[in-house]
């Protein structure tokens, strides 16, 4: 897949937010925007799932997106605190992540940045 045909991260985020809002049933979902007052490394999308569990979704471009060390650290902290954290590149991966979170799954691996 040529790099120019891979969707931008912004496109991935917008597709996921659209699906989350259309699907409904989630207590809360929002896109965390970077600003001078925002903390670096926070997940792109935060959701409260149907069980009331905190879910952090870090969106990346398919095949080429990589976590930073700080993003990996924060995703690990979310998982260690009882939340659910996932790196996603598509709506299909979000569907799987939300189902796993709602089933009570823990993150099965540590996130490694870089």
Language-model features, listed with the residues they occupy:
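Catalytic phosphate/metal-binding cores of nucleic-acid and nucleotide-processing enzymes, i.e., regions
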Residues: 1-114
């Amino acid at each position: 897949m040529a790099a120019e045909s891979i969707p931008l991260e912004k496109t991935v985020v917008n597709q996921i937010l659209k699906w989350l809002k259309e699907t409904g049933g989630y207590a809360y979902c929002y896109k965390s925007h970077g600003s001078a007052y925002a903390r670096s490394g926070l997940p792109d999308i935060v959701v409260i799932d149907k069980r009331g569990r905190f879910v952090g979704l870090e969106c990346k471009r398919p095949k080429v997106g990589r976590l930073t060390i700080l993003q990996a650290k924060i995703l690990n902290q979310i998982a260690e605190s009882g939340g659910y954290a996932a790196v996603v590149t598509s709506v299909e991966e979000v569907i799987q992540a939300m189902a796993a979170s709602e089933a009570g799954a823990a993150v099965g691996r540590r996130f490694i940045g870089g």
